[in-house]
Regions:
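N-terminal polybasic/positive-inside topogenic patches
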Residues: 3, 8, 12-13
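Alpha/beta catalytic cores of nucleotide-metabolism and tRNA/nucleoside-modifying enzymes
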Residues: 12-26, 44, 48-49, 191-252
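Glycine-rich phosphate-binding active-site loops on the catalytic face of alpha/beta enzymes
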Residues: 42, 115-129, 171-183, 225-245
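Glycine-enriched alpha-helix->loop->beta-strand junction motifs that scaffold or abut catalytic
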Residues: 85-89, 115-119, 144-147, 165-172, ...
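Hydrophobic faces of well-ordered beta-strands that scaffold small-molecule active sites
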Residues: 37-41, 70, 89-93, 120-122, ...
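Solvent-exposed alpha-helices and their adjacent loops that cap or buttress functional pockets
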Residues: 27-32, 113-114, 144, 199-201, ...
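Conserved N-terminal beta1-alpha1 strand-loop-helix module at the mouth
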Residues: 15-114, 150, 158, 162-165, ...
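Active-site-adjacent beta->alpha loops and helix N-cap segments on the catalytic face
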Residues: 49-51, 71-87, 99-107, 124-142, ...
């Protein structure tokens, strides 16, 4: 398993050593993703593949293919995948399909941590959240009680600035297309314009390209534009969508 964070089990507990070791672990995880592919392994409600064991098998297959990390949704999936792969697991909990639906509250984030996520992904927009907390308040609460890394899912440049100001470990363009939670269309590709703006304004920050990365060339273009790492999901792990793309092409 990915090493994660260490707490001395023997001898006198040293706060400074503990903090230094956690800082190193954080840095090692983020560095391990640089220039790499993160694969999102998710199935939508009601689909044949929506089962934790199935998701874990797919995650392991992606690891064998070269994925540097797995991004997954739901507590059972996080736990199952964490038990199957050696690479970091980015966990989230989707609630609904509109508004703030990616790990919308502190409660959801805590549950992802307890399920075994090495990194917790959450919506970084300034939209209202079910528990009334702001994004910044949620991040601060997580920092005060956990050593988990935080991935900020952003829609706009303002969201990216907010995430950087909150010292999030990974900052992603996940929501930039402003599409529904269930979106399997094959269309415009990743948001290279936002990616370039973010990497120019924040050089050295781990800006992740996510959203509509449908081909290897899309992934390469994102890295060339300055992405720290690239997330692809549907094009790799969602056979219903992939099949529909082929079928539609034959009908044109």
């Amino acid at each position: 398993m990915f090493a994660g964070y260490r707490v001395a089990k023997t001898g006198t507990f040293n706060v400074r050593t503990f903090c230094e070791e956690n800082t190193v672990a954080h840095s090692e995880l983020v560095e391990s993703l640089k220039g790499k592919l993160i694969v999102s392994v998710q199935a939508y409600p009601g689909e044949p593949m929506r089962h934790p064991e199935t998701m874990a098998q797919i995650a392991r297959a992606c690891e064998l293919g070269g994925a540097a990390a797995i991004r997954c949704q739901g507590l059972s999936d996080i736990s199952a995948i964490k038990g199957r792969v050696e690479i970091p697991v980015i966990g989230l909990w989707k609630e609904g399909h509109e508004g703030v639906y990616i790990t919308p509250t502190l409660r959801h984030a805590r549950a992802c941590i307890h399920a075994g996520a090495d990194v917790v992904a959450l919506d970084a927009t300034d939209r209202p959240r079910p528990d009334g907390r702001t994004f910044e308040e949620t991040v601060a609460a997580l920092r005060s009680e956990s050593d988990v890394l935080i991935m900020a899912d952003c829609m706009t440049m303002d969201d990216i600035r907010r995430a950087v100001a909150a010292s999030c470990d990974l900052v992603s363009t996940t929501l930039s297309h402003n599409k529904a939670a269930i979106d399997t269309t094959l269309d415009d590709g990743p948001d290279i314009a936002l990616l370039k703006q973010a990497t120019t304004e924040f050089p050295g920050i781990a800006i992740i390209c996510e959203g509509h990365v449908h081909t290897p060339q899309d992934a390469k273009d994102a890295l060339d534009a300055g992405a720290w790492a690239v997330v692809s999901g549907t094009a790799i792990t969602h056979p219903t969508s992939i099949t529909s793309w082929f079928a539609a092409a034959l009908e044109d």
